[in-house]
């Protein structure tokens, strides 16, 4: 494909004249890897087709929601039926009650839930709720964890534990982030020092249990255990951001994975998104009844939304959750994902390239490093130039991974063994070229 025949390019030029950067979310612009974004025309199963009609094996899946693949028959049927009943009412429906029941059935830490329209909205509301429920202002977050683009959470680390964070975006006043303390992921000593200094002021600790915006970095079990202990000890709320991991890594979400090693483990507030909407704009946050009843109209913490509980989105999410709750679903999904990461690792190492990978359920990540990183500074040591070469080599061969070094990948139940084999074969060719170059 040459620039003169690539139909994605004129679409991108048209978009750039109308939309900042030509995209409606920055990572889609290919700024990190260079080149022209692929404009999707349609998708089905494990594939999408771009403006040129080229088919790609899709390992993004709308950044996680498409756990069943694109166009699953049961989901399509549910959405079509709901659309015939009406797009939006601004009033309660039975379907949103059914979706709430389905979510709570699988996530026992949540006794009540509030539906919203995006992960950012859910995260922002969870922080407001934590502050309202505790009467405190300080929030802990971790370097490299992304919780949406709410002002108070667009923060990078300060110069030390005695100082609070600095905004990572223009337009965010310093006074908005002065109550946000940023720590290094998986650093128990730093965590303990933060609570020793500020414990009585901390409303909540917000964490991605698997940091999907550092590609794929797990919170260690000892670190997570200490997060829970310190929050309990100091009266702070543990807020689990499972927008990405919720129903993606296990039916009980990532918190159920940690509960295997930490008896009785539960967060205080859980933030969900992506999979629970099945690809439509839907997210949620929830927790124990005593905390959730602090929300309006019952309590003093205000939260509202015109499209919250949208009837078409809830139909999509409900159909998705009912499909993934079938026996054996996650076992098969995890096996397929491990086949992918294992095959990629073998192919890279055969060419003498450093490579490490990890996965849980249908979520995975890999690094061009000999060992898995444990926090943002170690993630940053990976070879960006080699990753970009790998990305474009796979893209040329019809395999679509995230166009950024620091984003997780996703396998769906629609990915076949043949898709995995085709991907590994393509990667083997690219690793050979990268190693030689």
From Swiss-Prot:
Catalytic reaction annotation: (S)-4-amino-5-oxopentanoate = 5-aminolevulinate
Metabolic or biological pathway, per its Swiss-Prot or TrEMBL entry: Porphyrin-containing compound metabolism; protoporphyrin-IX biosynthesis; 5-aminolevulinate from L-glutamyl-tRNA(Glu): step 2/2
Main localization, broad class: cytoplasm
Top EC category: isomerase
Record-annotated membrane-spanning stretches: none
Cofactor(s) for this UniProt protein: pyridoxal 5'-phosphate
GO annotation terms (biological process): protoporphyrinogen IX biosynthetic process
InterPro entries assigned to the protein according to its UniProt record, in alphabetical order: 4pyrrol_synth_GluAld_NH2Trfase (IPR004639), Aminotrans_3 (IPR005814), PyrdxlP-dep_Trfase (IPR015424), PyrdxlP-dep_Trfase_major (IPR015421), PyrdxlP-dep_Trfase_small (IPR015422)
GO MF term set: glutamate-1-semialdehyde 2,1-aminomutase activity; pyridoxal phosphate binding; transaminase activity
SUPFAM superfamilies per the UniProt record, alphabetical: PLP-dependent transferases
Gene Ontology CC terms: cytoplasm
Pfam annotation, one family: Aminotran_3
EC number assigned by the record: 5.4.3.8
Cellular localisation: Cytoplasm
Similarity comment: Belongs to the class-III pyridoxal-phosphate-dependent aminotransferase family. HemL subfamily.
Subunit structure: Homodimer.
Protein name: Glutamate-1-semialdehyde 2,1-aminomutase
Organism: Paracidovorax citrulli (strain AAC00-1) (Acidovorax citrulli)
């Amino acid at each position: 494909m040459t620039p003169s025949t690539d139909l994605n390019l004129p679409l991108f030029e048209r978009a750039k004249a109308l939309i900042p950067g030509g995209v409606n979310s920055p990572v889609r612009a290919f700024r990190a890897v260079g080149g022209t974004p692929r404009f999707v025309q349609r998708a089905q199963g494990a594939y999408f087709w771009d403006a040129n009609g080229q088919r790609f094996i899709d390992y993004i899946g709308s950044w996680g929601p498409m756990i069943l693949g694109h166009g699953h028959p049961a989901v399509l049927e549910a959405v079509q039926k709901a659309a015939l009943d009406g797009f939006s009412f601004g009033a309660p429906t039975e379907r949103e009650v059914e979706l709430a029941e389905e979510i709570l059935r699988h996530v026992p830490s949540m006794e009540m839930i509030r539906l919203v329209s995006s992960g950012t909205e859910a995260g922002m509301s969870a922080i407001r709720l934590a502050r309202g429920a505790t009467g405190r202002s300080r929030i802990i977050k971790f370097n490299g964890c992304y919780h949406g683009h709410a002002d108070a959470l667009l923060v990078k680390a300060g110069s030390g534990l005695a100082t609070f964070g600095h905004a990572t975006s223009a337009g965010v006043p310093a006074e908005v982030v002065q109550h946000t303390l940023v720590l290094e992921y998986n650093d128990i000593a730093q965590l303990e020092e933060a609570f020793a200094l500020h414990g009585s002021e901390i409303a909540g600790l917000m964490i991605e249990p698997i940091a999907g915006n550092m590609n794929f970095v797990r919170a260690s079990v000892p670190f997570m255990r200490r997060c829970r202990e310190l929050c309990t000890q100091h009266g702070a709320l543990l807020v689990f951001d499972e927008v990405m991991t919720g129903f993606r890594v296990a039916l009980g979400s990532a918190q159920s994975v940690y509960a295997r090693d930490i008896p009785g483990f539960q967060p205080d507030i859980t933030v969900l998104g992506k999979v629970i909407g099945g690809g439509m704009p839907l997210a949620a946050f929830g927790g124990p009844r005593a905390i959730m009843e602090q929300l309006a109209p019952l309590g003093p913490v205000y939260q509202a939304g015109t499209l919250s509980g949208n009837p078409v989105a809830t139909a999509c999410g409900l159909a998705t959750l009912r499909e993934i709750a079938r026996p054996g679903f996650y076992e098969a999904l995890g096996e397929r994902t491990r086949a992918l990461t294992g095959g990629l690792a073998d192919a890279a190492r055969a060419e003498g390239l450093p490579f490490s990978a990890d996965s849980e359920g249908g979520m995975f990540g890999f690094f061009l490093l000999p060992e898995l990183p444990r926090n943002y500074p170690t993630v940053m040591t990976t070879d960006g130039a080699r990753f970009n070469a790998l990305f474009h080599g796979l893209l040329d061969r019809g395999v679509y991974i995230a166009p950024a070094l620091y984003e997780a990948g996703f396998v769906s139940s629609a990915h076949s063994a043949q898709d995995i084999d085709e991907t590994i074969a393509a990667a083997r060719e690219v690793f050979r070229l990268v190693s030689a170059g």
